[in-house]
Amino acid sequence: MAVGGQKKVTKGGKKGGKKKTADPFSKKEWYDIKAPAMFPKRTCARTLVTRTQGTRIASEALKGRVVTLSLGDLSEKNEEVFRKFKLQIEDVQGRHCLTNFHGLELTRDKLCSVVVKWRSTIEAHVDVKTTDGYLLRFFIITFTPSVPRSERLHSYAQTTRIKRIRARLVEIIQQEVSTCDLKEVVNKLIPDSIAQDARKAASWIYPLGETFIRKVKVLKRPKADLARLMELHGESKSTAPGETVSRPDHYEPPKVDSV
């Protein structure tokens, strides 16, 4: 007695056979990312995007993309690798993506290495508007230094002094940023001069140790302007003024018989 039914024999194996897998990178192309003129290294990275197909345009897909690069990649200085700059693509010209400043942040390992026990950690944040219409939020962090040759293990600051230090830090950031445009602000963020000026101004309240601008966020930006972006990249086209020609009223150009 048969236990199972006889299997149907098909010719040529499974239906359809094995499908060929296409290489996903065959439909993509590379674009160079150009940093603003404030950074020493302009062409700093490359990015992939799907090629233009139908109504999907590659340049439009790139606009708004945010890339994160360390200051070491933007300036070729290995001691600045713990500071990350965020750049946003605002325009595409050929195979070059023109970017604008989008934020700043310290790496996680650097932030953990500067936090030490038995010392006061003082943090503050403030929203400042630049002269060209950018609303930025600054986060600053500082610490009280360890006292050498002291019987006490800790060097905590009093709460009243911490409040005064925090207010002084906020005041210095507002003074440094509110009178500058975005280009000048980025030029101050690259050497971290804002944090050092704030530390010097607040040290008379209580001695301070390492001070950093921990994070910068762009909360609001003005309407996109290609001329401003080209000026930020140092590629603004200067048009030479033309010479004015005086002509009488009701002037008509002469007729040309042949062209």
UniProtKB/Swiss-Prot annotation:
SMART domains: Ribosomal_S3Ae (SM01397). Residues 246-259 have a biased composition (Basic and acidic residues). Pfam families: Ribosomal_S3Ae. Keywords: Cytoplasm, Ribonucleoprotein, Ribosomal protein. One of its GO terms (cellular component) is cytosolic small ribosomal subunit. InterPro entries: Ribosomal_eS1, Ribosomal_eS1_euk. Belongs to the eukaryotic ribosomal protein eS1 family. PANTHER family: 40S RIBOSOMAL PROTEIN S3A. This is Small ribosomal subunit protein eS1.
